[in-house]
Every structure is written in C-alpha cells, then in structure tokens.
Amino acid sequence: MLLCFSGASSATFTFVNKCNFPVWPGILSGAGSPPLETTGFELAKGESHSLQVPAGWSGRFWGRSGCSFDSSGRGSCATADCGSGEVECKGGNAAPPATLAEFTLGGSGSQDFYDVSLVDGYNLPMVIDGIGGSGKCVSTGCTTDLNRQCPAELRASGGMACKSACEAFGSPEYCCSGAYNSPSACKPSLYSQIFKNACPRSYSYAFDDATSTFTCTGADYTITFCPNSPSIKSATGSSPKSTQATDNSATAGSGPGSDSNPTQDTAFTNSWLANLAIGDSPRCLPSSIIGITLTVAISFSLLQFL
C-alpha cells in the first residue's frame, strides 16, 4: 500500500513487521504539522507498507499489539492503544507503555531529527534506518526484548509491555517534573539505566538527549518492528495475542522469563537496589547486612558499565 502526497518535497517512510504477530502502527502529527493520509493501519506478520511524509512534518509513530477489532472496525489494543476505538487513531496518542519513533523533517539547516524514545516505556522492539540521505544518518532504536528484562514492578499488560519509572511511580525525580525539571536536577535513575544498558541509542529518560537524537538530510526512512528476530516473546514466554475489545487493562506480571543472561541479571540487581532506595525492598535485613549487600551489589552493577 502506498499513500502519497502531491509535491516533490517528501520522504518515503516504510514500515516493516518482522514480528511473528500483527502490529498496528499508530501515527500522531505534531502541532502545526499536516495530518498524514492515515493515522493507523494493520501490518500483518512479514508485511511492509509505505507512505509519503512532507518536508517540515513532525510527529511520532508507534506499534500497537494484541489488538482486536470487530467487523465494523471497532476495538482496542492491549499495548500502546490510542483510545480512538478504531484502527485509525484520529489524533489519539499512544497510551504508555509505548516505544516511540519521533521525527522532525527539514528542521535546522534542512536536517531531519529523529529518535526512538523509551521515556513513555516500552512495548515492542523498533529500529529506524535512514536510507539514501547525507550526513551521519545513524541507525537507532531498541532491538532488545525489554519485556523479558523488565523489573516486576514495571511490568504491564500481562508482561507484554514495560512501564517507565515515571509511569509506574509518578515521582518528580523519575518524571523530571517540578523541582527536577532541568538536566542538572534530573539524573538517570537505576530504572532508566536498565533501559539505557539494553538500548544505548534510545531515550531512556527525559533529558537523555546527548546520545539519543540523530540527524540526516534528504533521506527516506524504514521503521522496523522486531528487527532482530522473527519471534519476539513477552515476559510470559508467549507471543502477544489479540485480546477482546473489552480487555485491554494492564496486569502485573508474575516472575521473569526462564531465559537468563548477564544483562537480565543486571536489570534485576538494579531493580532490587531501586526498591531499596525508595523503601520498597521486600527484604528486612539488619543494617550491617544491608550495608555489606548494598556495597557488593553496587560494585557488581558498576562493573557492567566498564
């Protein structure tokens, strides 16, 4: 399917679904940007769809999963639902948690600016590739299945998505709000570091600009869902399934997946430390033991960055 605008100053955006389940891309144009000819569509396993996006456009794309729509096109999605009750989002934004691809085309010096953001959480692996442009045109995104590494307190939709710490706890220090609304005051948290370790080129928190925003000039773009594997599974060990339109509530997951790796071990170590820091650790230990354990755990965590 090719959706076109008139005029030559446009970029071709191609959406590719390498997941082993359908994905429903959602589209939201930024303030002052013209709406595209679609705001949402279904992308079956193995399919690709393209559309033209005019110069000067800004907005975001995301993938919805676990969707169920009836014969009249009414329904909802288990993750990243846009609230329209339809396949087309019609100006609706992605409900967190959602992996977001964000673009500003033809900005400063005619450059395109783009990023993949986990600030609103994560639901699907996603990669942006710039094609045929000039400049660095770095590929960016998150290829890791963060649902398998998601701390239990951040899990949503039965393990099909992973909340940000801001969404989960609402604290100003996690949301970079109030007194923390500046780069100097809002620093990476242990939770955002889990996201950053797994996806180094993605935004992990609100002020993660330096290593997360990229530029290209005159390029076309490919947005790929599940780029690394034909079978991306949730933390429950099964692929996302379509849900009934009346069932899109977020449900806390149980335990971690059966697979284990160093990154996942680090994630759960950091999760325990974060709980301890905010007083939610499930363990009650003498202060001397806590001190020794905390020292060892922090040392182990820091070694992962060396």
Indicate where each model-derived feature is located.
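Extracellular low-complexity, O-glycosylation-prone Ser/Thr/Pro/Gly-rich "stalks"
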Residues: 1-306
